[in-house]
UniProtKB/Swiss-Prot annotation:
Subcellular location: Cytoplasm
An annotated Gene Ontology molecular function: tRNA binding
Keyword RNA-binding: yes
Amino-acid positions noted as binding Zn(2+) in the UniProt annotation, renumbered to this chain: 567, 571, 669, 673
Official protein name in the record: Alanine--tRNA ligase
Organism from which the protein derives: Streptococcus pyogenes serotype M1
Gene Ontology biological-process annotations: alanyl-tRNA aminoacylation
Length: 872
């Protein structure tokens, strides 16, 4: 077996499959493009779903890739085991309706065992297979695999909901008896026992059925096009080929671990407690790649995942004695390890470091809050005479504050308290069940549509015309091909068409189809791409249509021009965002409609009003500069040399269109555009908002809609000016400001009067001092307008030695507000209010010196006040 670096393994994999006629698919962005069913790209096949479900036919049915992936359903196990990771690389080879079982197994065996390639010893390889899949068993035997090395497994059948499914055969490497201390042997495989001896290095899925949850597996229909989908983990291959005990001792992780050693002053012990090193090394890889691909830490979705990873890594850094921000210092090391295939981490190093450091600094403040929360929980246990920290509270510390369970356990036990492990496990399981349910909900690839996949007739979209005559090639009605149709709805394919099929954020054209007499025979309501790329016209049929007949196709020209204004403006907006807020503000989604444009982009905070003003100004300057718009067809590499902005994650064919707007914007784009930027007329941003963690959205209008937006604003301003009696529009702001200042002065005067009234009332309240258990206290109901007045009472009380404890209750509307203040260490205000609040059907909490609560039962106020003497 060859000893190769991870980069050599990856390259040898790709080279082998290229030698078998496969095209190399570049690794896609970790953030899925146009796939709402996935939070992350989580496998090599995830980006190829459109090929497997038949919605798109690839140019080459043989594909290979090395795909960066993220899976986060098992974060808590990362660092504990030898092979769990959040971010990993999946090497794959795929056949879309081309070769099948025989070639997949034979070539796979060749790659693994040939001296020209990986050169694995054959006697170290074991294969599992689905018991009913005798063909795979026989093919392995034909390759020279001993029958004793083939293990039938009932679970070797791959399916996720409806869609492509089939048996799979897995390949394992035997690391020997040293990794099997109990000498269990092949039963480890047969019974699926977790072990370190037999390492799964490759899975070959034989996708031959359309799974249907409504019928038994034996009744699944065969796919019209059988597929091969395989996955081999680079980290596992590297561990085996580099003789590493775990994935973490490979060249993918050890350089990071060495840097952590320098930062911590601790030494990584492969046989000792090294969990924190592993967690940090794993999580910083995931963070670096995900942030580089446009995901940002936040409170929801993938942003929450990143925040959780970062916080877990920081806490493990603290366990190693690293108490300052440090994760951002590891980003260059991650970039250097992966540079040969993923140069983007080093290219975006400054931005990634900035985001990681900023998030670390924020978490440092959160840790203080979490520590305070734990202190409060422990104080509450002490007050209640309990000795166990509940699982739900441990989970909240873990989930909300990022506290590892081990840290909570350590601090709680140091304080003399036990841990409710079962309660924590229950809360954790509930969260995992919710997460897994969400994944399964949209995880299937969808059923193949044989009718659409069978369309092979050529069809060409003509960019530069709004009307043309063309022959009708295909009619599909009720999901069946037919020669003619006279009513209802149908799908049509023409030899050529002026109708743009929806793609790249640009909506489809609408229009009409006419016969040779000039009569409209169909209305085009939508156009989408067929699996083989032909524009597929959805039409409402008004009169007879037949295959082979020529028709005149006319698009709605006015609508197309309105869409083009918005599409061209989108390119200008994208460039302006780069110039004003930074290169990281890349497209995360777009929609170019007739009435407006919508542009989503990656950014870590709201765009300020001043920045929006600059962006709007810059776009309009380019419109007024009357820039010529040109399109060029070329290959991707030439386009990039021209400076074209490729949208990371998008797939481009051999020939791409480059849209250039003067010297201001150059992008790869297959959409339609104006001839000159001046045709846009006017550009106006109408809204900027956040739509998810690290993603912002701008909605803008152009041309007539932009003019109307400005006019509507002017009308609103005129109305305001009239209301405040401003002589001219320019005076309206000053008038509004004067009214605001006057209102503020009146509110201040009113507050001062309230304070004086409260002080006068306080004089009476503070005279009623009682004593119990050696503690002086005041317990009184007061008549105030809001809860803030209670705090004013407390502030006045603190100024003099009226009593040790103050308890105030006020009925405000339908609510009861309670305040407890304490000057003595013998009475904890927060604990006391937790006993008082339930009396008025409320709850609350606070600090030792001040606490507040809210309730709903005003009839029990007297009972609450009477209880103070007992509780104090």
């Amino acid at each position: 077996m060859k000893e190769l670096s991870s980069a050599q393994i990856r390259q040898m994999w790709l080279d082998f499959w290229k030698s078998k006629g496969h095209c190399v698919e570049p690794s896609a962005n970790l953030v899925p493009v146009n796939d709402p069913t996935l939070l992350w790209i989580n496998s090599g096949v995830a980006t190829l779903k459109k090929y497997f479900d038949g919605s798109v036919i690839p140019e080459n049915p043989r594909i290979t890739n090395a795909q960066k992936s993220i899976r986060t359903n098992d974060i808590e196990n990362v660092g504990k085991t030898a092979r769990h990771h959040t971010m990993f690389e999946m090497l794959g080879n795929f056949s879309i309706g081309d070769y099948f079982r025989d070639e997949a197994i034979e070539w796979g065996f060749e790659l693994l065992t040939s001296p020209d390639w990986f050169d694995f010893p054959k006697d170290k390889l074991y294969m599992t297979y689905y018991p009913d899949d005798k063909d795979s068993y026989n093919r392995w035997i034909a390759c020279g695999v001993e029958p004793s090395h083939l293990v039938p497994i009932e679970d070797n059948f791959w399916e996720i909901g409806a869609g492509p499914s089939g048996p799979d055969t897995e390949i394992f490497f035997d690391r020997g008896e040293d990794f099997d201390p109990e000498n269990i042997g092949l039963r480890l495989l047969a019974e699926d026992i977790e072990n370190d001896r037999y390492i799964e290095i490759w899975n070959i899925v034989l996708s031959q059925f359309n799974a249907d949850p409504a019928v038994p597996r034996s009744e699944y229909k065969e796919l019209p096009n059988k597929n091969i989908d395989t996955g081999a983990g680079l980290e596992r291959l590297a561990a085996v080929m580099q003789g590493a005990k775990t994935n973490f001792e490979t060249d993918l992780f050890m350089p990071i671990i060495r840097e952590v050693e320098k930062l911590s002053g601790k030494t990584y012990d492969p046989d000792g407690d090294n969990m924190s090193f592993k967690v940090i090394a794993d999580h910083i890889r995931a963070l670096s790649f995900a942030i580089g691909d446009g995901a940002l830490p936040g409170n929801e979705g993938r942003g929450y995942v990143l925040r959780r990873l970062l916080r877990r890594a920081v806490m493990h850094g603290r366990r190693l004695g690293i108490n300052e921000t440090f994760l951002y210092k590891l980003v260059p090391t991650v970039g250097q390890i992966m540079e040969s295939y993923y140069p983007e981490v080093l290219e975006k190093r400054d931005f990634i470091e900035k985001i990681v450091k900023r998030e670390e600094e924020t978490f440092a403040r959160t840790i203080d809050a979490g520590s305070g929360h734990l202190d409060s929980l422990l104080a509450q246990l002490k007050a209640e005479g309990k000795d166990t920290l509940e699982g739900k509270d441990i989970f909240k510390l873990y989930d909300t504050y990022g506290f590892p369970v081990e840290l909570t356990e350590e601090l709680a036990e140091d304080a003399g308290y036990k841990i409710d492990h079962e309660g924590f496990k229950s809360a954790m399981k509930e969260q995992q069940d919710r997460a897994r349910a969400a994944v399964v909900k949209g995880g299937s690839m969808g059923m193949q549509n044989e009718t659409l996949a069978g369309i092979v007739e050529e069809s060409r979209f003509e960019y530069d015309t709004y009307s043309l005559e063309s022959s009708l090639s295909v009619i599909i009605a009720d999901n069946e091909r037919t020669e003619a149709v006279s009513e209802g709805q149908a799908l049509l394919v023409f030899a050529q068409t002026p109708f743009y099929a929806e793609m790249g954020g640009q909506v489809a054209d609408t229009g009409r189809i006419k016969n040779d007499k000039g009569d409209t025979v169909a209305e085009v309501v939508d156009v989408q791409k067929a699996p083989n790329g032909q524009p597929l016209h959805t039409v409402n049929v008004l009169a007879s249509l037949s295959v082979g007949t020529n028709y005149t196709l006319e698009i709605n020209k006015e609508r197309r021009l309105a869409v083009e204004k918005n599409h061209t403006a989108t390119h200008l907006l994208h460039a302006a965002l780069h110039n004003v807020i930074g290169e990281h503000a890349t497209q995360a989604g777009s929609l170019n409609e007739e009435e407006f444009l919508r542009f989503d982009f990656t950014h870590f905070e709201a765009v300020s009003n001043e920045e929006l003003r600059h962006i709007e100004q810059e776009v309009n300057e380019q419109i007024w500069n009357a820039l010529t718009i040109t399109t060029t067809e070329t290959d991707v590499e030439t386009a990039k040399e021209m400076g074209a902005m490729a949208l990371f994650g998008e797939k481009y064919g051999k020939v791409v269109r480059v849209v250039q707007i003067g010297n201001y914007s150059v992008e790869l784009c297959g959409g339609t555009h104006l001839n000159n930027s001046s045709e846009i007329g006017l550009f106006k941003i109408v809204k900027e908002e956040g739509i998810g963690s690290g993603t912002r959205r701008i909605i803008a209008v152009t041309g007539r809609q932009a003019f109307e937006a400005y006019r509507n604003q002017e009308d609103a301003l005129k109305e305001i000016a009239a209301t405040v009696k401003a002589p001219q529009l320019k005076d309206a702001a000053a008038k509004v400001q004067a009214l605001s200042d006057s209102l503020r002065d009146l509110q201040k005067e009113n507050a001062e009067l309230k304070e004086k009234a409260a002080a006068a009332a306080a004089g009476d309240v503070f005279k009623d001092v009682q004593e119990a258990k050696g503690v002086r206290f005041i317990a009184s109901q007061v008549d105030v307008a809001d809860a803030g007045a209670l705090r004013t009472f407390a502030d006045n009380w603190k100024q003099k030695d009226y009593s040790d404890v103050l308890v105030l209750v006020a009925a405000i509307g339908e609510k009861v507000n309670v305040l407890v203040a304490s000057k003595t260490k013998d009475v904890h205000a927060g604990n006391m209010i937790k006993e008082l609040a339930p009396i008025v059907a409320g709850r609350g909490g606070g600090k030792p010196d001040m606490a507040m609560a809210g309730g709903s039962d005003a009839s029990k106020i007297a009972e609450l006040l009477a209880a103070v003497a007992e509780i104090v």
